[in-house]
């Protein structure tokens, strides 16, 4: 990801719930810097520069670079969980699975810059912050695991390893954030493709 120009992808509107405006600019700058350079290689000066602020001004709003990463991770994981909860609709487990995977994949494509950070910089979080994010990650896994279990129960899915298959389905969607660029594919079309692939993985 190093050297990738992603700054034009992260819209400040993502952080419209954050006050004041300076804090929003810092979050936008942090996402872009972390996605482009990686958490460890990013300095507070990098982030402040992208926000049009001095390094000292960053600490007025966030006590550390890690705190910025935590805020980004918290937002990204909660947003992804809400996408799954909203998409868990349909008369059959197959319909629900396709809806879930389609929405989850499209989200990771549309928000690939944020998703890169929240998925691949987890190790940089403090133990306390990591534990909080891990709780949300378990809820995300549960959304997929439940629909797979329902499909096994009614005989429409052939799944012998429920946790392993859950991880495989989630990984399919999440990995989109690693390679996605806007010119590669339409998020909705990609979601449909991955929904088909996930269904084929588990159908009887």
Identify what each model region corresponds to.
Residues 11-16, 72-99:
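Amphipathic alpha-helical linker/stalk segments
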Residues 22-25, 29, 33-67, 71:
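Helix-turn-helix
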Residues 106-145, 178:
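Short secondary-structure transition hinges
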Residues 116-120, 130, 134, 152-197:
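Hydrophobic/aromatic-rich alpha-helical bundle segments in the mid-to-C-terminal region
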């Amino acid at each position: 990801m190093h050297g990738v120009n992603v700054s034009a992808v992260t819209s400040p509107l993502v952080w419209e719930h954050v006050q004041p405006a300076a804090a929003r600019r810092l979050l936008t700058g942090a996402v872009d810097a972390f996605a482009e350079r990686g958490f460890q290689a990013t300095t507070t000066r990098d982030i402040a520069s992208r926000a049009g602020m001095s390094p000292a001004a960053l600490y007025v709003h966030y006590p550390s670079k890690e705190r910025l990463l935590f805020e980004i991770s918290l937002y990204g994981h909660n947003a992804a969980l809400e996408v799954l909860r909203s998409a868990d609709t349909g008369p059959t487990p197959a319909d629900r699975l396709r809806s879930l995977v389609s929405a989850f994949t499209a989200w990771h494509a549309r928000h690939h810059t944020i998703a890169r950070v929240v998925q691949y910089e987890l190790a940089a979080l403090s133990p306390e912050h990591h534990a909080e994010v891990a709780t949300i990650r378990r809820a995300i896994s549960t959304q997929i695991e439940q629909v797979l279990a329902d499909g096994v129960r009614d005989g429409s899915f052939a799944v012998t390893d429920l946790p392993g298959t859950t991880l495989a389905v989630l990984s399919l969607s999440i990995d989109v954030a690693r390679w996605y660029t806007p010119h590669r594919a339409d998020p909705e079309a990609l979601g449909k493709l991955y929904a088909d692939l996930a269904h084929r993985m588990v159908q009887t």
